[in-house]
Design a protein with these regions (language model features):
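Bacterial Sec-dependent N-terminal signal peptides
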Residues: 3, 20, 24-57
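Bacterial N-terminal signal peptides that target proteins for export
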Residues: 2-18
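Short, solvent-exposed beta-strand-terminating loops
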Residues: 35-36, 109, 174-182, 272-283, ...
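Acidic, His- and aromatic-enriched active-site or binding-groove loops in soluble protein domains
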Residues: 129-131, 173-192, 256-277, 345-362
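Domain-core and long-helix interface of multi-subunit machines
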Residues: 78, 200-343, 438-462
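A metal-dependent hydrolase metal-coordination microenvironment
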Residues: 54-251, 307-308, 328, 513, ...
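C-terminal functional module detector
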Residues: 40, 44, 52-66, 70, ...
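Short secondary-structure boundary/capping segments
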Residues: 117-126, 169-171, 254-257, 284-289, ...
Length: 561
């Protein structure tokens, strides 16, 4: 999204470039504990446990590996990008520069003006045609030539959801990016947008029948599209809710429940760690700065639905819903023409760390559904091992663990941070400041799982989870460096009611003025200034001074002894 040089607004945050550069270096190591993480030598590993008897072999390790990727990436074929964002350049940033393993391209499902190389088309075309004629052939040609042959790339699209905001839709079919898959995207665009039927082949229009909507401005029309995906591609499609709170009043929790109830294998992810972080209003959340719009702010760069402890995401998890949080770049461009700023390149700032046996788009979708994922900004951490153990086994992110009432649950957290992140000074110089991200604390968050709310009852509108709380705050006093280079900590809790556990970590202390209060993130302020270059550097420093990660939950189902 293009951002013009901003005018002054309520609640501003003015920065000088040099001051923020210094502040960044302070904030990365500052906070409730101060200093760097435990820097002792690696401790000796514990003595190995006796080998299990042949009658009780250890459980097999989960198949797969950790991968890193982005589900929300635009190119020049979107109507609000810039000439610098050709397909080849975007893929080069994602894979060659920032080392991602997988990318879902997600250009707007609107009229498209350009081909994949940025050449202006003689006439506007539906993006589904641009995908079929330009984007997919180029992806296939690159991979056939050996370029990115070991990467997973596929074409999805960002849909303007009727009466809501944006959703990423992937229609993979049994053969992603095949002629059948591309035809399905074209049919979706015909049925569920206001595109003129004359823009589509007459034979297809005759076969598809009348368009699904009229004004494309009701929630019911969005539900029609979800139902269509479920009917036709129940196992090979998804709809991700993008930047859900960017504009006030776009979703109620009842509507989110309704979509997930209808198609739980399709509507299962929220883009809580939003892209467009280079905008003056972080994430492009630029509604009026008034108290009524506090739910439409970001909090440490995270959407209110996810950032609010005991809020919407926790309310959904408290029902046992498998709805996951993700982090995406929403890349259009970083800066353009020295005037505008938008977001970071794929893999530069926002990352999804996803575990799975990922070889292609279908296995990627399966891994996303499984939910063994943590999302992070600014490479605060680059590895996380989060387990809850009972007498029945071990639960990991996205799974459910059985436990007996009253038994001790052993919760372990192991994490690692890289030697540096991608903070540049000056922005765009290619000169990295060699700032090592430092975790100040990690919150272990727990909430009770009380069962599904039913349509037509007051509970279906419940957008809070009163039982959700921080049960343990880990600091450098709690963790130790282990033999594998991870900082490790543990905590024991008694199994009571059905519960879930999740993690949230930051480089900030618990009470940093303007940033956190009692460990909770505060709403992000607008960053502005009349000098464009200084403003770009201030925005960049703001983002790298305020880093968070969020894990997906581990569910625990408790049975009576």
């Amino acid at each position: 999204m293009k951002i013009l040089p901003p005018a002054p607004r309520f609640r501003t945050s003015l920065f000088s470039t040099l001051a923020l550069g210094a502040a960044l270096l302070t904030a990365c190591g500052g906070g409730s504990g101060g200093g760097a993480p435990f820097a002792g030598l690696p401790i000796a590993p514990p003595a190995p446990a006796p080998a299990p008897s042949p009658a009780t072999p250890p459980p097999a390790a989960p198949a797969g590996r950790w991968t890193v990727g982005d589900l929300h990436v635009h190119t020049i074929q979107s109507d609000d990008t810039q000439q610098i964002s050709t397909l080849d350049r975007v893929l080069a940033k994602a894979f060659d520069t920032f080392g991602l393993d997988w990318v879902a391209l997600s250009d707007h499902l609107r009229l498209s003006f350009y081909d994949n190389d940025g050449h202006k088309l003689p006439a506007q075309i539906p993006f589904s045609k641009g995908m079929a004629d330009y984007q997919v052939p180029r992806i296939k040609a690159l991979q056939a030539s050996g370029k990115y042959a070991d990467k997973t790339i596929f074409a999805s699209f960002e849909w303007d959801m009727a009466t809501h905001d944006h959703g990423n839709v992937g229609i993979l079919t049994d053969s992603p990016m095949s002629d059948a898959a591309l035809k399905a995207v074209s049919q979706f665009e015909y049925l569920f947008t206001n595109r003129d039927a004359a823009l589509f082949p007459a034979a297809d229009v005759a076969a598809w029948g009348p368009k699904a909507g009229t004004g494309y401005n009701t929630h019911a029309e969005t539900m029609q599209a979800v139902a269509w995906l479920k009917k036709n591609y129940p196992a090979t499609s998804y709809l991700q809710i993008n930047h859900p709170s960017r504009n006030p009043g776009k979703y109620t929790i009842a509507q989110l429940r309704e979509m997930n109830d209808l198609a739980p294998d399709i509507v299962f992810s929220l883009e809580g760690m939003v892209g467009n972080q280079m905008e003056p209003d972080r994430g492009g959340y630029n509604s009026a700065y008034i108290d009524a719009n506090l739910p439409s702010r970001t909090y440490g760069g995270v959407d209110h639905l996810v950032a609010k402890l005991g809020g919407t995401w926790d309310a959904l998890l408290s029902e046992g819903r498998r709805i996951w949080n993700v982090a995406d770049s929403d890349y259009h461009f970083t800066t353009s023409r020295g005037l505008y700023s938008s977001g970071y390149a794929p893999g530069e700032y926002a990352k999804n760390h996803l575990f799975g046996d990922i070889k292609d788009p279908k296995s990627l979708l399966a891994a996303m559904r499984a939910g063994r994922l943590f999302a992070v900004n600014g490479d605060l951490i680059d590895a996380l091992d989060f387990q809850v153990k009972s007498s029945k086994g071990a639960g990991r992110m996205g799974t459910e663990l059985a436990a007996a009432a009253g038994e001790e649950l052993q919760i372990t957290v192991r994490f690692r941070s890289p030697e540096r992140n991608n903070f540049e000074y000056q922005l765009g110089s290619g000169l990295y400041a060699n700032v090592k991200p430092v975790v100040d604390h990690i919150d272990l968050i727990a909430g009770d799982v009380t069962g599904r709310e039913q349509p037509g009852t007051p509970g279906y509108d419940r957008a809070t989870s009163p039982s959700t709380r921080v049960v343990k705050r880990f600091t450098r006093a709690d963790w130790k460096l282990d033999a594998e280079g991870y900082y490790a900590a543990s905590f024991t809790v008694k199994a009571g009611a059905n519960q879930y556990f999740r993690l949230r970590g930051t480089n900030l202390g618990t009470d940093v003025p303007g940033e956190t209060a009692n460990g909770e993130p505060l709403p992000d302020a607008r960053t502005e200034g009349n000098d464009n270059v200084a403003r770009f550097n201030a925005i960049n420093a703001r983002n790298y001074a305020d880093l968070w990660f969020y894990s997906n939950p581990v569910f625990v189902k408790v049975a009576a002894k």
